[in-house]
């Protein structure tokens, strides 16, 4: 390679190059975490309904399964938050640009209502996701196999839809936050000039 080509390559910022600066280990860890959380939320944990500690004390089983569902839901929030943040850092445009424009105008008119509504959506999504995962964990306590499989499929579809809503909300949250910060920086630069 010539010196001119090396100079042109070094001028490209890491965000413009994409995720090439990310190590293979980081990618592998992220994929393994995604697989573990997906498995934990879409399939029941056998130990929670077969171990004698949980079969003898159903109240303990309910508490442990609810705590398990809460931690798995936190894992989903970590996945979608990190993915939205990484997308924003790479400089990719938001997927929902028209919706973001309307939300940005709403945020300009009512900033406190917008923030409150967004956090309410996060809380409701977390609550619904936790309850759905909890129901998946409790599904094998019933006897009818066909009914259990049908309920499992319905609950898995509901979990997937809630995850789409969470991903969408994180993207809106981060893109609106970035749009406001960029606009504020532009106004500050005009004031100093």
From Swiss-Prot:
Record topological domains on the Cytoplasmic side: 80-119, 169-193
Major subcellular location class: membrane
Residues in the Extracellular compartment per record: 1-58, 141-147
Annotated stretches, region: Disordered: 1-21
Any one of the GO CC terms: membrane
Compositional bias annotation for Polar residues: 12-21
Compositional bias segments (type: Basic and acidic residues): 1-10
Cell compartments where the protein resides: Membrane
Function: May be required for cell cycle progression.
Protein name per its UniProtKB record: Uncharacterized membrane protein YPL257W
Organism of this sequence: Saccharomyces cerevisiae (strain ATCC 204508 / S288c) (Baker's yeast)
Source lineage: Eukaryota, Fungi, Dikarya, Ascomycota, Saccharomycotina
